[in-house]
């Protein structure tokens, strides 16, 4: 039987977990095997910016950061389960990637 590997990425931790919960509910309803969600390392993108625009004065810095949270889910590729997966309402700032493996 084929397996579907689902990779979720997003900057909002709560939205990523919400989509994981929806996938888990679909797996329980359809009775397919589910492995995960496996938390992958969170990527931190840090951008230091000087507060002073003209370069005069003391060097004080603002540090802006964006965190990218990732989850990995393996699920059996049952036709009924995959059709329901395609219908999930995913927020637009969450990336979802589905790869079928044999």
From Swiss-Prot:
Keywords: Ribonucleoprotein, Ribosomal protein. GO terms for molecular function: structural constituent of ribosome; tRNA binding. SMART domains: Ribosomal_S10. GO terms for biological process: translation. Transmembrane segments: none annotated. InterPro entries: Ribosomal_uS10, Ribosomal_uS10_CS, Ribosomal_uS10_dom, Ribosomal_uS10_dom_sf, Ribosomal_uS10_euk/arc. It holds the Pfam family Ribosomal_S10. PANTHER family: 30S RIBOSOMAL PROTEIN S10 FAMILY MEMBER. Belongs to the universal ribosomal protein uS10 family. Involved in the binding of tRNA to the ribosomes. This is Small ribosomal subunit protein uS10. It comes from Methanosphaerula palustris (strain ATCC BAA-1556 / DSM 19958 / E1-9c). The gene is rps10.
């Amino acid at each position: 039987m084929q397996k579907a590997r689902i990779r979720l990425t997003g900057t909002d931790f709560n939205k990523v977990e919400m989509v994981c919960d929806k996938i888990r509910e679909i797996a329980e309803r359809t009775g397919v095997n589910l492995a995960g969600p496996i938390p992958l390392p969170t990527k931190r993108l840090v951008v230091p910016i000087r507060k002073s625009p003209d370069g005069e004065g003391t060097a004080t810095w603002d540090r802006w950061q964006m965190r990218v949270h990732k989850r990995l889910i393996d699920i059996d590729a049952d036709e009924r389960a995959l059709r329901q997966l395609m219908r999930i309402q995913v927020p637009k700032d969450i990336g979802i990637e589905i790869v079928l493996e044999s």
